[in-house]
Design a protein with these regions (language model features):
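Active-site phosphate-binding/coordination module
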Residues: 1-71, 248
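Short hydrophobic/aromatic-enriched beta-strand-loop microsegments
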Residues: 2-8, 131-136, 186-190, 204-206
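Short, polar loop motifs at secondary-structure junctions
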Residues: 10, 115-119, 190-194
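Short glycine-enriched loop/turn motifs at secondary-structure junctions
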Residues: 14-17, 104-107, 135-136, 181, ...
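Catalytic cores of large soluble enzymes that bind and process phosphate-bearing ligands
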Residues: 25, 112, 204
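Conserved acidic, metal-coordinating active-site core of Asp-based
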Residues: 36, 42, 47-170
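Mg2+-dependent phosphoryl-transfer enzymes with acidic/Ser/Thr/Gly-rich catalytic loops
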Residues: 125, 140-248
Length: 248
């Protein structure tokens, strides 16, 4: 079986022992994004080969707790939450620009900036050579213009010899929309956004209710027996599953 990770919205793809594809942001772009974030008191994290480093606020927001909170807040509260959020981040001491400049000595594949949806246009106008996508309404994922998760998967296809039509992908956020629309089977998670569900081939259960396992079972790829038990005819799949159960 194939064993790889497509990270940073398709900008850094690796196996357990080698990098298959990497597309770093220009140093000048990263530097100017840091300056912009510092000027506007916006927390920022830089995506390197060792992980997303920089902002503690962003680390909290990308944690399971942060994702849970963002999904249980009613949409009708969006404006109120946005105002409160802007007020909150103004109270934080700006990050050290020197620390961020030290981090950017390494290749940076993605920048994550604390910014509401309403601020997207201003950032895009300031930085026309980047693409902004989102997995949260409170942070912006910034990668090179013209790039995406789908293009990252296409690069994998060139390496391993498969077509996008042969791919099944799962998603729950805005930054998954192009990917789910472009692969053979796009599966929207039950906890995902409505627009994603409208475009998906199939809508499964939530991530907390074995949504991925249920979708794989729906398409006959595994045998989903109970909420906590499923197997596959692929021995490699079963070994990976057993390993994750052990680690959990």
């Amino acid at each position: 079986g194939l064993d790889f990770a497509v990270t940073y919205n398709g900008q850094y793809i690796l196996t357990h022992d080698k990098v298959l594809y990497q597309n770093q942001l220009p140093k000048s772009t990263v530097y100017n994004l840091i300056r912009y974030a510092t000027k506007h008191r916006r927390e920022i994290s830089l995506g390197t080969s060792t992980g997303l480093v920089g902002s503690n606020i962003i680390s909290m927001g990308t944690s399971k707790f942060g994702q849970m909170v963002s999904r249980i807040v009613p949409k009708s509260w969006a404006k109120m939450v946005e105002r409160s959020f802007k007020s909150l981040i103004r109270r934080f001491k700006p990050q050290s620009m020197e620390t961020l400049k030290t981090i950017m000595r390494e290749p940076v594949y993605q920048v994550v900036m604390v910014a509401t949806v309403g601020e997207t246009q201003a950032i895009e106008e300031k930085f026309p050579h980047v693409k902004i996508t989102r997995s949260s309404p409170y942070s912006a994922d910034i990668i090179s213009a013209g790039q995406s998760k789908l293009k990252g998967i296409a690069h994998l296809g060139e390496v391993f010899g498969f077509e996008l039509s042969e791919v099944m992908a799962f998603g729950d956020s805005e930054n998954d929309l192009e990917m789910l629309s472009g692969v053979g089977i796009g599966v929207a998670m039950g906890n995902g956004e409505d627009e994603l569900k409208d475009q998906a081939t199939h809508v499964t259960d939530t991530n907390n209710q074995n949504g991925i396992a249920k979708a794989l079972s729906h398409y006959g790829l595994i045998h989903f027996e109970t909420e906590n038990s499923f197997t596959s005819d692929d021995d490699n799949f079963n070994k990976v599953k057993d390993f994750h159960h052990l680690m959990d």
